[in-house]
From Swiss-Prot:
Name of the protein in question: Non-structural protein 1
One BP term from GO: symbiont-mediated suppression of host cytoplasmic pattern recognition receptor signaling pathway via inhibition of IRF7 activity
Source organism: Rotavirus A (strain RVA/Human/United Kingdom/ST3/1975/G4P2A[6])
Pfam families xrefs: Rota_NS53 (PF00981)
Region RNA-binding, residue ranges: 1-81
Function: Plays a role in the inhibition of host innate immunity by inducing the degradation of key host factors required to activate interferon production such as IRF3, IRF5 or IRF7. Associates with components of cullin RING ligases (CRLs) including CUL1 or CUL3, which are essential multisubunit ubiquitination complexes, to modulate their activities. Recognizes the host NF-kappa-B regulator BTRC through the presence of a DSGXS motif in the C-terminal substrate recognition domain.
Keywords, sorted A to Z: Host cytoplasm, Host cytoskeleton, Host-virus interaction, Inhibition of host innate immune response by virus, Inhibition of host IRF3 by virus, Inhibition of host IRF7 by virus, Inhibition of host NF-kappa-B by virus, Inhibition of host RLR pathway by virus, Interferon antiviral system evasion, Metal-binding, Phosphoprotein, RNA-binding, Viral immunoevasion
Length: 486
């Protein structure tokens, strides 16, 4: 049983504030939810279980029970998950406010302990102070958190997470902020709480406290396409697809790291909750994570033999050729932008090969083929540049004054001609490695200019940022027929 979940279940009965704040989906009647996919910790109830995607950010961090409330750590409504979420620079005062909130919602004193013991002793087998009956009293106050970095903003979701060594397939990693606060001071707070417990429970409380307060922070993870809803990934190849998300909001915005102080004034907190509502946003999929997913999918279907062929059609329109025909039934080719990039890259590469190598047919086996498979994924800059360099070397460049050149005197299509003029100012007769890098990047940047893209989608924006973008109608970046250059 998850300690935090149990604590919320029992403590929500002690007063009106707790009844509202500690209400978790996992402790209520179960409702159907999307199929679970990843193992990890639910940010809402802190239990380790199978996770489903969040309706607010499309990442996997909700269990199938908590998903019914649709709470996200990026909401503006001050529910418990939001009040436990801190952002960027966390100060000692911020952590003091968090500890005060814990003491307000999960107090341990003689009156509370006696109340729980009396309500638990309903049967002979419950007379002993066994941990399974008093799990809710064994939640220490720690500064344990799950952290994530989203385009320069670091979020810390504090809570009590059991079984830290269990499998974690989410983009969140454990962080310990006790050094920002004070170890001895936090020890004293927990020892005071522990002193009210029966002796039989004190040792278990101490073990839990020290195991969750003295660990070393993990290395922060990189967010990838695997961490987002499968439904979003499946629809990425539709250029007009928009991600639909919902956020729990209030009319007033407060200091992000100061949200945990709201429980100090109960009447003001309830007045604030009266303005709570759900806002709906339609979000573009444009970001580096999703762009790289598209380019990687296209890379799996590359037919490198086209660069030595004599086909008069573009690379994606070749039919009935054993070595050059691609399977257009794959979803990745539904995005005309990917097809444009593929056609122009291979038209340019074929012109390079035909200008510098004596190869007459696509059935020939050439060393250059093994390096062409990585020419689309420009998001992996180091790997991409290595591939382009190897292709350049396969063309047997001529060195003049310490600079290597290759010929460029084969015909190319009008799209490539226009891009040549835009990138190098003319249609050249000779090219250096740097020229080729610039031209190939220009072909890809025409449709997916990753230089000006966020790493993660705008679904990971806070509500305030989403509202600002919606005012300027910028949550949807561009119509599907207009390129990044245009």
């Amino acid at each position: 049983m998850a300690t935090f979940k149990d604590a919320c279940y029992y403590y929500k009965r002690i007063n009106k504030l707790n009844h509202v704040v500690l209400k978790l989906g996992v402790n209520d009647t179960w409702r159907p939810s999307p199929p679970t996919k990843y193992k990890g910790w639910c940010l809402d109830c802190c239990q380790h279980t199978d996770l489903t995607y969040c309706q607010g950010c499309t990442m996997y961090h909700d269990c199938q029970w908590c998903s019914q409330y649709g709470r996200c750590f990026l909401d503006s409504e001050p529910h418990l998950l939001r009040m436990r979420t801190f952002k960027n620079e966390v100060t000692k005062n911020d952590l003091m406010n968090l500890i005060d909130m814990y003491n307000t919602l999960f107090p341990i004193n003689q009156k509370i302990v006696d109340k729980f013991i009396n309500s638990t002793r309903q049967h002979k087998c419950r007379n002993e102070c066994m941990t399974q009956w008093y799990n809710h009293l064994l939640m220490p106050i720690t500064l344990q958190s799950l952290s994530i970095e989203l385009d320069g903003d670091v979020y810390y979701v504090f809570g009590y997470y059991d079984s830290m060594s269990d499998i974690n397939q989410t983009p969140f990693s454990f962080a310990n902020l006790i050094d920002i606060y004070d170890k001895l001071l936090l020890d004293n707070i927990n020892f005071n709480r522990m002193s009210f417990l029966p002796v039989a429970l004190q040792q278990e409380y101490a073990l839990r406290y020290f195991s969750k307060s003295r660990f070393i922070s993990e290395k922060r993870k990189c967010v990838s396409d695997l961490h987002f809803s499968a439904n979003v990934i499946e629809n990425l190849h539709n250029p007009s697809f928009k991600i639909q998300i919902t956020r729990n909001c209030i009319e007033l915005s407060s200091d992000w790291n100061g949200a945990c102080k709201l429980v100090e004034d109960v009447s003001a907190y309830f007045d604030m909750l009266k303005t709570s509502h759900i806002e709906f946003y339609s979000i573009s999929t444009r970001c580096r994570v999703f762009t790289q997913h598209k380019l990687k999918m296209a890379s799996k279907h590359i037919k490198p033999n086209y660069v030595t062929s004599n086909h008069r059609t573009s690379a994606t329109e070749v039919h009935n050729c054993k070595w050059c025909s691609i399977n257009n039934s794959y979803a990745v080719w539904n995005d005309f932008r990917v097809k444009k990039i593929y056609d122009n890259i291979f038209n340019f590469l074929r012109a390079l090969v035909k200008s510098n190598a004596n190869v007459g047919h696509c059935s020939s086996q050439e060393k250059i083929y093994e390096h062409i498979e990585d020419v689309l994924d420009v998001c992996d800059d180091e790997k991409w540049k290595t591939a382009v360099t190897e292709i350049f070397n396969c063309l047997e460049p001529v060195e003049l004054d310490a600079v290597k050149y290759v010929l460029f005197n084969h015909e190319v299509n009008w799209d490539v001609i226009n891009l040549l003029v835009q990138s190098v100012g003319k249609v050249p007769q000779i090219l250096t490695l740097n020229d080729i890098v610039i031209i190939m990047k220009s072909i890809i940047y025409e449709w997916f200019d990753i230089r000006y893209m966020r790493n993660t989608p705008m679904t990971t924006f806070t509500v305030d940022k989403l509202r600002q973008l919606c005012t300027g109608v910028k949550t949807v970046d561009y119509d599907s027929g207009i390129s990044d250059v245009e």
